[in-house]
Design a protein with these regions (language model features):
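FAD-site-proximal beta/loop scaffold in flavoenzymes
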Residues: 126-154, 258-321
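A Rossmann-like FAD-binding core segment of flavoenzymes
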Residues: 36, 79-89, 93-96, 104, ...
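Glycine-rich, N-terminal phosphate-binding loop of Rossmann-like dinucleotide-binding domains
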Residues: 19, 100, 113-114, 245, ...
């Protein structure tokens, strides 16, 4: 970074990059523990979204307007909110550069900007998304279009896609399939619809325990699975999508498939300012110790949420646990004490297999099952639907973003 191009500087103590679930939740938890902390949050967006409900919006089970609030209404009191984007990180000198050329110096840095949806990596997608039957529940603007198109469809060919991992909420691509098929089944038109799920990977779900119960629903809805099939191009007006298909020998061929409805999940990458920084791992994500969530080379830096280069599921449930780990470990570091807490990789994916029933998949590193409740986690339950559709959204706005920590029991360092 060249000093001569920098604008006015901001001197800060604790700096948090990102005002999403991880950023706001962490700041609220830090202030609960130590109300006099000097915290600066850098977040350009004027709105805050509850993204886990967008799958429900696409299935006609949630009002999209209830998934967004003004950022100012969720920003904890007493925080210095800098409404700008970060364009560079210089951890060797403890400073950031912003989109308006200002610089921010810090003593401790928390990296939690989320990830970037790389729509542009699929040729033709940005031009046609939200029209011609091309949609995505990964977008606030288009989740309602999903439901509109699902209701209108009475027959034809439907393609659902899932890109290469990692992505946020790895179960969301198939949730779109299940809720759509459930609607068509109830409407009596499912037999007129050819449903195909194209996955860039070779497994329906990353934790093998949950594959058999999910396969029962794939079979119930008569959906066809196309593994190692990666969406690379879309022509909306021509109702055609192209996939790169890899065979057992690793040979890739491109195949065109027509559709009446296409639900796309875009590739997902780290924001450029992280991927280009010294904080990044080889894949561009923020490198951290998988248990302490502290950067291995810059001890004053922690990360949490989707940006982490850890193998856990990128979900809000993971963030709920990570918040406590980072809050406790950061405060211990500032007091020059050993870091007390370790993260076990917990993540949760409430798989909405039909309207009114959810398979609640909870697991940690290496796919270890970590159920919260003493029930068979592979059984679809109405109670889990209530948790997903009613309790968790309420707790998000009224608990998690206000520093209230629920079901966050964690392991302490031996």
């Amino acid at each position: 970074m060249n000093d001569q191009h920098w604008g006015p500087s901001i001197s800060a103590d604790i700096v948090v990059i990102g005002g999403g679930t991880a950023g706001i939740g962490l700041v609220a938890s830090l202030l609960k523990r130590s109300p006099h902390l000097n915290i600066t949050v850098i977040e350009p967006d004027s709105r805050h979204f509850y993204q886990p409900a967008w799958t429900l919006v696409g299935g006609g089970a949630y009002n999209v307007e209830n998934t967004v609030r003004p950022m100012a209404s969720v920003m904890p009191r007493g925080v210095n909110w800098v409404q700008a984007a970060v364009t560079g990180i210089d951890p060797d000198h403890g400073r950031l550069i912003l989109s308006d050329a200002r610089t921010v110096s810090y003593k401790n840095l928390i990296v939690c900007p989320g990830l970037r949806l790389a729509w542009e990596k699929i040729e033709g997608l940005e031009e046609t998304l939200g029209q011609h039957g091309v949609t995505s529940n990964y977008s606030y603007r288009h989740a309602t279009y999903t439901w509109d198109q699902v209701q209108k469809l009475r027959g034809g060919k439907v393609l659902f896609t899932q890109p290469a991992m990692p992505i946020k909420c790895a179960g969301a691509p198939q949730k779109a399939l299940y809720l759509s098929c459930d609607h068509w089944n109830r409407a009596g038109v499912l037999n007129n619809i050819d449903v195909e799920f194209n996955l860039a990977g070779a497994a329906l779900f990353g934790v093998a325990t949950f594959v058999p119960p999910l396969m029962k629903y794939i079979e119930k809805y008569n959906a066809r699975l196309a593994f190692n099939s990666n969406l690379v191009k879309v022509d909306g007006p021509a109702k055609t999508a192209w996939f790169d298909i890899k065979d057992a020998e690793g040979t890739v061929t491109r195949q065109a498939k027509t559709f009446d409805l296409l639900h796309v999940v875009p590739p997902q990458v780290a924001p450029d300012f992280v991927a280009r920084s010294p904080l990044a791992d080889a894949a561009g994500w923020c490198e951290v110790d998988p248990h302490s969530l502290q950067h291995p080379r810059y001890p004053g830096v922690f990360a949490l949420g989707d940006i982490c280069g850890t193998s856990n599921a990128k979900t809000a449930a993971a963030v709920r646990k990570q918040i406590v780990v980072v809050a406790e470990n950061l405060l211990a570091l500032r007091k020059q004490r050993p870091l007390p807490l370790k993260y076990d990789g917990y993540g949760s994916c409430p798989l909405t297999v039909e309207k009114g029933k959810v398979i609640l998949a909870e697991f940690g590193y290496a796919g270890k099952l970590l159920p919260t409740f003493p029930l068979d986690p592979t059984t679809p339950r109405r109670s889990a639907w209530w948790l997903k559709a009613t309790l968790l959204p309420w707790f998000y706005w009224n608990g998690m973003l206000k520093g209230r920590e629920w079901l966050t029991r964690l392991s302490r360092v031996d």
